[in-house]
């Protein structure tokens, strides 16, 4: 079957790889000159299935009000003037109760755990390199309340069979030795030994090269203007004066998927702006070993070979990609607070990207009401964590095979009332 994939971020390229391995003739289209040059370029670098959790959580509405007055707040909201943003935020608020949180986290962990297994299999099969580490993830708590709240998430981990350790502050250095110097600032941590880390952009670009060698065609520097539909099927992708045709089409444009599908399929995917720093390592014994998550500031600090990636925060501000100095200061503050000798912060590279987020935090993966239009988008802050599993799942569904995990609740059908955002003219094109 001929398949066109729209988008060459980590999700789009993973989809291309698994569809090619299933015997399909795959073409990937993207406006950028190469793979992983937008949202997949400089994310936090963590592959953390056990920490897969929606931003829509109990207590978040009240916290959001407090965060409005804090300098280093993990979440910020600025109205973009669209009804879609208001509807999206209302849907998110409706998911902030305990029952919805547990349901959403459960299916997110399910997909993320499966994805980690798919990544392991891919690594064993291809020996793909991406500065990966298998040292686990450590969530750090600065208050007793955070430590106590961890028991809620532990219940979900136990149900999913995810191993964990709940550590008091005196034991944190057993996992991350450099934290011995700052243990007095912390109340404890939750460690998940099976989690991994790695450079998402490096992985995506290497996988794209492998996919191309296996027969996948990449059409870079090719902005997409429109999906062409007739009745209940898509019959082409309009790119300038050219119409590219296939038997099936996969939407993996990330945050730009919603606007591109306007008038065809309503999906609840909105951009969640995040930031990162990439820092050269200064002192080896003062740097992280793997990944830590600062629960207070919602910031991850991840170790690559000779670099530290610091990423996090969430801004609900539309498609604004301005680099804001106060956000850089927050990232610098957290990494200096926890790893004061770890990196040359003054040499850091500052970056921002738009993560495609659904109100319930779970991506939309599967077929739409159009028989040949498929979705693989809405992974939020977990695109790297969920990419391989989502790609394999999509390949199985499109190929008529039974997936290895339950998948019905990942469909866009769970949003039965639909979303209809405006389509800004400047959003035409692919998203990576």
From Swiss-Prot:
Gene3D superfamilies for this protein: D-Amino Acid Oxidase, subunit A, domain 2 (3.30.9.10), FAD/NAD(P)-binding domain (3.50.50.60)
Write out the residues that bind FAD.
3-17
Gene Ontology biological-process annotations: D-alanine catabolic process
Describe which pathway this protein belongs to, using the record's wording: Amino-acid degradation; D-alanine degradation; NH(3) and pyruvate from D-alanine: step 1/1
Q: Which domain of life is it from?
A: Bacteria
| Keyword Flavoprotein appears in the UniProt entry | yes
EC identifiers of the protein = 1.4.99.-
Protein name per Swiss-Prot or TrEMBL: D-amino acid dehydrogenase
State if Oxidoreductase is listed as a keyword. yes
The record's section on NCBIfam families has: PRK00711.1
| Function field | Oxidative deamination of D-amino acids.
Coiled-coil annotated residue ranges, if any: none
* UniProt-recorded Gene Ontology molecular function terms: D-amino-acid dehydrogenase activity
Show the catalytic activity: a D-alpha-amino acid + A + H2O = a 2-oxocarboxylate + AH2 + NH4(+)
Keywords of the record, alphabetical order, are: FAD, Flavoprotein, Oxidoreductase
Q: What InterPro entries does the entry give?
A: DadA, FAD-dep_OxRdtase, FAD/NAD-bd_sf
User: Which lineage?
Assistant: Bacteria, Pseudomonadati, Pseudomonadota, Gammaproteobacteria, Enterobacterales
């Amino acid at each position: 079957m001929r398949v066109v994939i729209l988008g060459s971020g980590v999700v789009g390229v993973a989809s291309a790889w698994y569809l090619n391995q299933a015997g399909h003739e795959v073409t990937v289209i993207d406006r950028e000159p190469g793979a992983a040059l937008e949202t997949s370029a400089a994310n936090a670098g963590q592959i953390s299935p056990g920490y897969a959790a929606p931003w829509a959580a109990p207590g978040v509405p009240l916290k959001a009000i407090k965060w409005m007055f804090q300098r280093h707040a993990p979440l910020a909201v600025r109205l973009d003037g669209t009804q879609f943003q208001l509807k999206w935020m209302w849907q998110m608020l409706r998911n902030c109760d305990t029952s919805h949180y547990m349901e959403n986290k459960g299916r997110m962990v399910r997909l993320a755990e499966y994805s980690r297994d798919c990544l392991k299999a891919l690594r064993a099969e291809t020996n793909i390199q991406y500065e990966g580490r298998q040292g686990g993830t450590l969530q750090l708590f600065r208050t007793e309340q955070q430590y106590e709240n961890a028991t809620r998430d532990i219940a979900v981990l136990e149900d999913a069979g995810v191993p964990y350790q709940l550590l008091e502050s005196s034991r944190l250095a057993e996992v991350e030795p450099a934290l011995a110097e700052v243990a007095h600032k912390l109340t404890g941590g939750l460690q998940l030994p099976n989690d991994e880390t790695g450079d998402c952009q490096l992985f995506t670009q290497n996988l794209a090269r492998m996919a191309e060698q296996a027969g996948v065609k990449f059409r870079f520097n090719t902005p997409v203007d429109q999906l062409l539909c007739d009745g209940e099927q898509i019959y082409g992708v309009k790119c300038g004066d050219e119409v590219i045709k296939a038997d099936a089409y996969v939407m993996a444009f990330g945050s730009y998927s919603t606007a591109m599908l306007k008038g065809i399929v309503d999906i609840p995917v909105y951009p969640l702006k995040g930031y990162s720093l990439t820092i050269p390592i200064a002192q080896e014994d003062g740097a992280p070993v793997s990944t830590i998550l600062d629960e207070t500031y919602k910031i991850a600090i991840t170790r690559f070979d000779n670099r530290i990636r610091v990423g996090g925060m969430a801004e609900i501000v539309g498609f604004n990609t301005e680099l804001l100095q106060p956000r850089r200061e927050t990232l610098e503050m957290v990494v200096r607070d926890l790893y004061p000798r770890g990196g040359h912060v003054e040499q850091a590279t500052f970056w921002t990207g738009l993560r495609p987020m659904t109100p319930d935090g779970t991506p939309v993966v599967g077929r739409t009401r159009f028989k040949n239009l498929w979705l693989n988008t809405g992974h939020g802050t977990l695109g790297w964590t969920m990419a391989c599993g989502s790609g394999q799942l999509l390949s199985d569904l499109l190929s008529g095979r039974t997936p290895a995990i339950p998948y019905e609740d990942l469909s866009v059908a769970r949003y039965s009332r639909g979303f209809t955002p405006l389509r800004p003219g400047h959003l035409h094109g692919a998203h990576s």
